[in-house]
C-alpha cells in the first residue's frame, strides 16, 4: 500500500513538469491580395515554379524539373551571391492555379523558420480581378524551449509575413488594385 501511495505521489509531482516541457508549436499564416487583372494573367506571372522574378526580394531563380512534382529551385536573395533558399515542389495544378512547396534548406539567419511549407493560389475575385492567397505553416527557427528573440515564434511569423506581403504588394503594383 505504501508503495502504491509513493508511486501516485511521484506521478502527481511529475505530471505538472511534463506540461512545461513542450517544444514549439506549428505556426500558420495566410496573406491575401486583391489585384485588378484576371486570374489567368496573374497565374501567367507567378505560376511557374522556376521563376520568382515577380518577387522583389528574389535576385534570381535556378532549378530543375519545371513544374513537375519534386522539381527543385534555388532562390538567390538580394543580389548576386546573396543568401539562398532551396525549395522543392510537392503539388502543382494549372487548373486550380495553385502550387505547394517546402523549403529543404535555408539558414535561420536568412529566414528564422524550420519545417516550412507553403501554398500559393490565384482565384477569381467577386466583382472581377483576382484574389492571390499565400499561406504557410512552419516552426520557429529555434527548436528548443526559451528561444532567443530572433528565433522565436514572433520572429518567424514576422519574417514569413514580410516575405508574403512584399510579394503580394509587388503584384498589386504590377497589376493594380481592383477599382483603381
Task: Name every feature range the model reports, one short phrase each.
Residues 131, 138-180:
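A conserved amphipathic terminal alpha-helix motif
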Amino acid at each position: 500500500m505504501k508503495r502504491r501511495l509513493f508511486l501516485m505521489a511521484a506521478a502527481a509531482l511529475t505530471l505538472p513538469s511534463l506540461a512545461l516541457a513542450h517544444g514549439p508549436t506549428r505556426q500558420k499564416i495566410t496573406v491575401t491580395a486583391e489585384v485588378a487583372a484576371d486570374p489567368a494573367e496573374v497565374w501567367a506571372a507567378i505560376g511557374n515554379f522556376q521563376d520568382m522574378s515577380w518577387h522583389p526580394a528574389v535576385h534570381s531563380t535556378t532549378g530543375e524539373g519545371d513544374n513537375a512534382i519534386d522539381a527543385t529551385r534555388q532562390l538567390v536573395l538580394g543580389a548576386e551571391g546573396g543568401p539562398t533558399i532551396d525549395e522543392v515542389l510537392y503539388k502543382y495544378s494549372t487548373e486550380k492555379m495553385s502550387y505547394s512547396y517546402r523549403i529543404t534548406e535555408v539558414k535561420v539567419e536568412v529566414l528564422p523558420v524550420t519545417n516550412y511549407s507553403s501554398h500559393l493560389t490565384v482565384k477569381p475575385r467577386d466583382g472581377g480581378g483576382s484574389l492571390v492567397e499565400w499561406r504557410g505553416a512552419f516552426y520557429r527557427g529555434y527548436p528548443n524551449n526559451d528561444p532567443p528573440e530572433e528565433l522565436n515564434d514572433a520572429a518567424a511569423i514576422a519574417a514569413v509575413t514580410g516575405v508574403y506581403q512584399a510579394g503580394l504588394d509587388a503584384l498589386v503594383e504590377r497589376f493594380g488594385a481592383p477599382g483603381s
